[in-house]
């Protein structure tokens, strides 16, 4: 599962480099690697407790938002009725996304590469 998410993450990053070479972005790698017990402990000590940082941070403001943060998934985290699946990790990620939105960042879950590209293009056009 994580490997497929990494492939999507890498594709989005290559897309950003090609289409928007002057835009700064940061891609979280911690979720895609296995940390030793001591590394996991040290990493936890320097993270904001309870905050689940999205996988991709695009550090480019537009007219409406301070930046674009995307939590990448390989499939939709939503049920057919639009509700988030009941999962503690997903719920924590959704809370972090909502907190980011309140602070002026455009943040969301996304799982389809073509949809992600369209949304990034739309965001970048709105300058």
Set out the residue ranges of the language-model regions.
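Catalytic phosphate/metal-binding cores of nucleic-acid and nucleotide-processing enzymes, i.e., regions
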Residues: 1-127
């Amino acid at each position: 599962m994580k490997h497929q998410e990494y492939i999507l993450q890498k594709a989005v990053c290559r897309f950003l480099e090609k289409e928007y070479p002057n835009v700064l972005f940061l891609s979280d790698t911690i979720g895609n690697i296995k940390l030793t017990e001591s590394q996991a402990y040290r990493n936890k000590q320097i993270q904001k407790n309870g905050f689940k940082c999205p996988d991709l941070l695009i550090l480019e403001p537009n007219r409406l938002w301070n930046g674009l943060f995307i939590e990448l998934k390989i499939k939709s985290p939503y049920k057919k009725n639009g509700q988030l699946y009941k999962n503690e990790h997903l719920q924590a990620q959704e809370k972090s996304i909502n907190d980011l939105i309140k602070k002026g960042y455009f943040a969301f879950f996304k799982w389809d590469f073509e949809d992600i590209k369209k949304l990034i293009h739309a965001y970048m056009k709105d300058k």
